[in-house]
């Protein structure tokens, strides 16, 4: 009896989750694609090129590690400084800026032969990819889903898990055909293809429905506040 009761609970939870997903498909898919696109600035993705970058720029393991650490620390500092922009500026405009910037960085990697520019590229990939493209959907979920943000996050973050699973295979295949430098153009093109799709999905931003007319104040980066309404 206990087993049957537990099974009924699981079924009910699955049905609730499916209903939630279908009702909020556009916004959940948009956030999932943002998490997916952040992969181009994540460590697991950039590390696919570690040996090729070290060989091309004649770097030791220590040199490359220092460059990567510097770019990561600098991007983390910039997130503290600029992370609050999402609270002050229109979400879609900021999203477009981040996507285009990350795409340009991917194309720049194709053409680059300067060590100094490489340092800037690594910083940019970490800031716009690992930083902003993970920050934006996280803030959006808090703004759009209120008390259901945990449920929304658990669904949307699957986009990142998908990228983490497929990109190593896809990029290894592409690198074997076109070389490591030109393979970065795949990222630049893919980002430009995903962007208009997300913008279309977010043509109308989700407005949480208030059942109690209560407002929660959520503090984000830079001590900015987001008004979140109970659903």
Language-model-detected regions and their locations in the chain:
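Glycine-rich segments within core transmembrane alpha-helices of 12-TM secondary carriers
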Residues: 149-168
């Amino acid at each position: 009896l206990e087993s049957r009761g537990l099974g009924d609970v699981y079924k009910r939870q699955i049905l609730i989750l499916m209903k939630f997903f279908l009702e909020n498909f556009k916004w959940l898919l948009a956030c999932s694609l943002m998490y997916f696109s952040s992969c181009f600035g994540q460590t697991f993705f950039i590390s696919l090129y570690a040996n090729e970058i070290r060989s091309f720029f004649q770097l030791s393991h220590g040199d490359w590690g220092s460059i990567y650490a510097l770019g990561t620390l600098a991007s983390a500092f910039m997130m503290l400084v600029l992370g609050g922009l999402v609270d002050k500026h229109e979400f879609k405009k900021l999203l477009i800026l981040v996507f285009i910037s990350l795409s340009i960085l991917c194309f720049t990697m194709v053409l680059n032969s300067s060590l100094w520019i490489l340092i800037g590229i690594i910083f940019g990939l970490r800031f716009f990819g690992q930083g902003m493209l993970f920050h934006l959907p996280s803030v959006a979920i808090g703004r759009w889903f209120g008390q259901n943000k945990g449920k929304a996050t658990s669904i949307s973050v699957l986009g990142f898990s998908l990228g983490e699973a497929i990109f190593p295979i896809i990029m290894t295949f592409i690198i074997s055909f076109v070389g490591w430098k030109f393979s970065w153009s795949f990222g630049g093109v893919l980002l430009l293809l995903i962007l208009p799709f997300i913008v279309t999905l977010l043509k109308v931003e989700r407005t949480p429905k208030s059942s109690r007319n209560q407002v929660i104040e959520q503090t984000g980066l830079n001590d900015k506040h987001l008004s979140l309404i109970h659903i």
